[in-house]
């Protein structure tokens, strides 16, 4: 037989085998593959517990904790779970199940913070010893550990404690040390330690005048009634005060905020010297916000720094943040131009203050010098931290296609390239900044990449890759996901959509459509991340 004939037979014999393998590889998804908790649930690889110890990256595994040098990616064993548990057992201090919950808040000390069975334990991983132990009362919740001095603020039921000392003794209907105002306006906690831990600000919410609404606890063996205080439309709402507790004297004062008592007190922060408390007060109609400064010792109002109004609404979301290198200047965030941006404020001088109109239709007045640092048709997300050496604020920026991390110089206003410039600027990027601001852990995904984790040098933008996850649906038959925009009724505003077509989609057929819309605030459903933000079961 000729060589050509032999080749033809070999190719023909190989084709059915190849087609058979391909047919076997293409699988159909089931609910078990798509629903969290399913026996075959498909999820992307991840690295849990990544964080910084100063400028050294901590990378835990199930039984070993590694350090990663951010310049080279070199990994070194820091300690093991077995070693930690041996010391804990020797001191009858309990057992740590995994290393993923360990914190490393002290950049200048070889110490870690453990939380085990209602106790906070400071552990020296260099000398393998327990430095201190603090036990909380039973039913402790809303815990707030002060890194500066090791004190812990927490609540038991509706009252506030510091360590084992009760700070408040209020009856049912008055709640202390918990988040207030239904967690709106950036509120997600109820206690605020001063920078050195000498004072503790906290919320006190009187809702005794609010009617109770019955909810059913379905987790009990037999359903139980759980009454919550919830003001129905037009009915009396709760009243909030801000207290300041001094652990050294045991005394508490309250800010003299005056009337009306049903307004919102949001975005609490401290001055670096602990002498002043700053907060943004919002009226009940939510259309007039005022940045106020109070004396932390007397509770007296020291002055108004900024005011903003709008005929529709004003929505403060972020507390002011002082520059680490200048205690007289802070960063303020505002949506006054239609997009959330950063503003640099200076306390060293004052202004007479005049109302000025804003591009977004509102008005503002400044009683201290204020300079806009960022601008454009995009949003500032969270401030991630600072690089004091380069005088930079490092933050997350968000636009219609995704998010990324940037730096802006407070002196010049110059903004950096996106930190992921050397890898991909596409997708959703979430950053965790090192202590000095020199490095950043960048977790991100794109519509076709489930997850990648890099360490980024915030100056050179060079990266060290820690993880590139494989597609968990590789080998499965997948639907087609399309994204785009349609115009709102005004004919101008773009509304982003995500369209998922079935795997056997026939363009010549007419299909029923399930339209899912949740138009709530801060509920972005279409993203530039993995599968454009679609959940597996969508």
What would you call each of these model-derived segments?
Residues 1-27:
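Bacterial Sec-dependent N-terminal signal peptides
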Residues 9-12, 57, 469:
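Hydrophobic alpha-helical segments with strong N-terminal bias
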Residues 12, 17, 228, 235, ...:
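N-terminal hydrophobic or amphipathic segments with adjacent small-residue motifs
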Residues 21-416, 438-439, 449:
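Beta-propeller folds
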Residues 34, 212, 274, 428-538:
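Serine-hydrolase catalytic core recognition
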Residues 282, 296, 310, 335, ...:
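Hydrophobic alpha-helix feature that most strongly marks membrane-spanning transmembrane helices
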